[in-house]
Regions:
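Rossmann-fold dehydrogenase core element
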Residues: 108-122
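Short, Asp-centered acidic motifs that coordinate Mg2+ and/or phosphate
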Residues: 32, 68-69, 119
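Beta-loop-alpha module in the N-terminal Rossmann-like domain of NAD(P)-dependent dehydrogenases
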Residues: 39, 49-112
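N-terminal Rossmann-like dinucleotide-binding module
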Residues: 1-49
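General small-molecule cofactor/ligand-binding pocket signal
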Residues: 31, 55, 121
Length: 122
């Protein structure tokens, strides 16, 4: 069976550590991560996972055909847009809660899932 390859995009909340640990414990391989800027969490992420490459351009992860699933734990108001961008790039997504912060975001997520047939999970 093929090993699931994942990436982390948006590491603004500490839940990313639990999300990633759970997936790694299941045998997934994290091939990279991206965050828009630096903070204590990104510093801790780099320290905890020094062998996972940080990309400075998220498009390097979005365009990588080997990545099956993207973990997202950004600021809540940014999660929906990141998820939509990932699904439009052919990736399934697993978000920290809440997955969206408005009914408009929810509607756009639903439309994207129908259009792309990608998995949106929280």
């Amino acid at each position: 069976m093929k090993k699931l390859k994942i990436a982390a995009i948006g590491t603004e909340h500490r839940h990313i550590f639990g999300q990633l640990k759970g997936m790694l414990d299941l045998g997934c391989e994290c091939v990279g991560w991206w965050n828009d800027g630096d903070n204590k969490i990104t510093d801790d992420f780099s320290e905890k996972y020094p062998t996972i490459k940080r990309e400075m351009d998220k498009n390097n992860l979005l365009s990588n055909p080997e990545i099956d699933l993207v973990l997202i734990a950004d600021i809540p108001s940014k999660r929906a847009d990141l998820a939509i961008e990932c699904m439009e790039a052919g990736k399934d997504v697993m978000l920290d809660k809440p997955g969206c912060t408005s009914l408009d975001q929810l509607k756009r997520i639903e439309q994207t899932v129908l259009k792309t047939k990608r998995i949106f999970s929280i």
